[in-house]
Amino acid sequence: MTIKNIATKAYTSSATALWGCGLAAVLVLTGCSALPAAPTRPVLYDFGPGPLATVPTDRRAPLAPLALADMDAPGLPEGGNAVLYRLAYADAQQLRPYSQARWSQPPAQLLQQRLREQLGLRRAVLKADDGAAQAREPAQGNKLPLVLRTELEEFSHLFTSPSESAGMVRLRATVVELTPSGESLRGQRVFIVQQPAKSADAAGGVAALAAASSQLAGELAAWVEQVGQ
C-alpha cells in the first residue's frame, strides 16, 4: 500500500468519525428539546388578608357569646381544594374543577373563618367543642351560649351563559339552645348569595365567591342577632 493510499484511507476514516460525532450531537440536542416541560403548579387562592387594622370599638352593647360549630360541606367533594364551576346552560348537574386553580384551604374552612370574623365584631365567638362554650353566662341568666351550626350546600362559579357568570354560595344555618332537656331549635334559614364575576375564568370566579362570602357573612350575623333576642 502506498503512502498516498494510506493517507487517503486515514482521511476517509477521520471524516466518517467526525460525521458520526456530529450526527450524535444533533440527535442528543433533538432529544433534549423534545423532553416534556415541567408541569405548571396550580395558582393558590384565598379570600384575601382579612382586616388590615383594628376595627373601631362598636358603641352598641356587646352581644351574648356564641358557640360556632365546625362547618359541614355536604354539597362539596370531601376535603377538596379545587375551585369549582358549573355550566347551568349546558350541564347544570356537573361540578367541574379548574385545572390550574386551587383554594389554599377547603372552602368550608375559608368561609368559617369569614363568618368568625364577622360574628366577632360584636360578640365573643367560641368553638362549640371548647370547654368555654359550656360555661354559663350570669348576664344571660346562667344560660349556655347559643350554638350556630352551618352546612355549605353550594360554592361554585356558576355560568348562566358562556359570557355571564357569578360566584354562588348557598348555606344552611341552624341556631339551637342547649337546655337541661336537650337542644331547642331557635331558628333555621338558608342563605343564597350571588355576586357577578368580572371575568369568565378562575380568577373572576374566586373574586366573585369571596365577595359573595362576605355578603353572606353579614346577612347571617344580622339574622343570628335577631334569633338571639
Show where each model-derived region lies:
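Bacterial N-terminal signal peptides that target proteins for export
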Residues: 3-22
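Hydrophobic helical h-region of N-terminal Sec-dependent signal peptides
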Residues: 23-27
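Soluble periplasmic/extracytoplasmic beta-strand elements of cell-envelope proteins
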Residues: 65-72, 86, 147-151, 168-174, ...
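Sec-exported extracytoplasmic/periplasmic mature domains
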Residues: 116, 120-124, 157, 221-228
